[in-house]
Every structure is written in C-alpha cells, then in structure tokens.
C-alpha cells in the first residue's frame, strides 16, 4: 500500500472515531438544555403576594412573570377570584390574613400548573385592577367605600331595588319596591283587619293577599292611631295637628300632602267641637267612635253617649256603647256632656267630620309625617308637624313612601341600628330618596317598626330581630 492510500485510511478512521464522540457531546448538550428548560418551568411561579391597607382601599399585589396569564372575576357574594396560569409559592397555601373589615383574608389554592387566589370581601365592594412594570406586577385595589343597587323586576309593574352603601365606614342597606298604579291599587290595612289592633306587617299583608306591604302609622300603647286614617272612604282615626299623609284621590291618583281634620257635633242644645275619632276619651272631651274601634267604646259610665244613625239618635248610654256598621257614637264628658245632656232617642244629632281639599274626596289616607321631599327638594316638616325627637333625633331604621317622577309609587324601608346598616337621619333619608328619583315623600313610623314584606316574605332586617306588631300597613294589591 502506498503512502497516499495509507493516509486516506487513517483519516477515515479518525473521522469514524470522532463521530460517536461528537454525537455524545451533542446529546449531552441537548440533555443539559432540556434540564435547564425543565428547571425554568418548575421555577416559573408566583413567588410573592403582599398587601397594604389605606383609609380608602386595600391593595393586593402579585409579582408575576413576563408570560403569566390571569383572569379576574367578582363572584355574586362579592369575593374576587384571581386565576393564574402558573402555580404559587407553597408558603402561601395556608392563606393570608389581611385582618381588615373590607378584606379579612386571602384564600390561596395551587397545583403544579395553575393557581387561584380568592380575595375574601366582607361587602360587595367595587375594585380596580392594573399592572405595574419593572418588575411585572398585578395589583387589585378593593375600595372601602361603595354604593350600588341591584334591581329585579318581580312582575309587570313591580320592581324590587336592593341598595347597599358604605361611606366613611358607615354602612347602609335599604329595600325598596317601585309599584305601578296601572297594575296595583294602594290599600291601607288595620292590624285587626276590619278593627283597630296591632299585628305584624306580614299578617296584614296576608289579610289582603298583598304583593307588597310596609308599616305605616304611629300608634300608642293601646290601639290608638296617631294621624288621619281613611280606608275605602271611611274615616278610622283623626288628629288635630296637620300632618303629611299619603293617599289615593277619588280618581285613583296617588297623592302626598298636608292632611287637616276637624269635627263638630250639632244639636238643638248647641254645637260642640270633636276632640277626635276612635281615641281615648278624657275627663273633658267629645270623642267619636265607629265600628273600626272594636266591639264597643270601652268607656266608663262617667260620660254620656249617643248612638247616632243617619243624624238621628237611636240610643242613649252612659258608657261602653256597642259599635255597629253605619252608626257612630258621640261620647262626651266635661263641658261637652253638659251641653249635650238631655237629648233623647229620635232627636237630631248631626256629626260633621271635615277634611281639607283634596283629601275630603280621597278614598284612602295614611296621615303620618313628617314630609321628607317636596317637588324633588328636601323638605323636612318635623317642627311644623310637632314630630318628637324620638323620630328626628338620631340615625335610625326608616320607612317612607314616595311618588316618583314617572308617577309610580316607591315603598322604601331602610335598616338601622345593626352592623350591616347604621340607619339615617331624616335629612339623609330624604336625600337618599331624591337619589332614587322621588319627587314627593312622607316619612312613616320607623325604628323597630320598619319592615317591608314582598309576596308574604320579610325582605329587610327589622332592628328588634323579629317583627314588631304595629297598627297599620300600606299595601299594594293587584288590580
């Protein structure tokens, strides 16, 4: 073999020897690269979660990678759910205690590939979110102050509004119902059905199969009502103080305005002014009674009582006269008794009960007060109407009825004296109602009496922790 052939054979051998070595080096490089890539994937995770608290918000910050994907959604209960495309450092899996009234805790869930953080929100608070750079971070700001309403149409002409707010740490919650007069009529209901008594709002709602019911009148320790009440054209109670009332006019129009009552009894002996209707007779008064008061007047025999039908005396008693439909009892003591004494069965006794216009022709009235809103402006008439400090003096649960710009009627009940709702002063309540587009509104009895019933179910949280028996309810009944 010549030298040239020997050289060629040697070179081929060297190449053949080097090829496995090169392949080995290439394979080794691939293994190293694979290992590095794998380690990078394993280390690609959310390594840091932190938070800060300020007077107006709680900020939660996530350190995320360049290729991290995420999805943020608020759940119906207010919690904020953040889904990540990579796992979270295991040190956070036990959760994070934020210890704030708005955001008490962060729940953390993670597997080898994805993760989820649930920001527990005590209230259905609004939030903002965004990113910060260098390094990349996701932040979520949960607002401590909020105000929102949830609206739900229950049926044609009936819409429920649930209101929630938190301002400067003060929470408020109200339940409201917008009712169309086209589909519903507005009916005052007595606690005893056809008699004056106390009962729960839900019971009064059941009396008339109401779609909506809320508490209405002020009342005494007995069964007396404070304010003018008129049901289906019949007067049930009175008050000599002018008070604001809600009612239904002769043409069916809902109306809010000042209600003024006066009464006079005319006889051949002279005229006497009426002290009131279906109230407590005192030692010097002329009180009228009708069938709505109960079975009888319940008076002692210190006075004189005339049972009157069609302006004629049909019976004379000294007290505790029976009360029948179509009859009215004139019960007098003191000076009124002196004037009316000596009248007999068959004598004329004309009883006049007078209401100011347009209430004189109204079918239904609930006189309560004070007025809250007039022509879209705050108008608190508590001083004029001589409303006591127990109503005006502090934040409390509130009940009102208002007439909206569109002519619909708004039933409104605000919770109070509870952690979830502080309650409002009257002027706060008035401004709140104006925010709901109320044009005119009157305040009803509040405090532990405040209650709203929809479809037979209580939808607010009475401050007594249970239903309080009350004197009257305003209801909306399907036409």
Per-region residue spans from a language model:
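Gly/Ser/Thr/Pro-rich low-complexity, intrinsically disordered segments
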Residues: 19, 25-65, 69, 77-82, ...
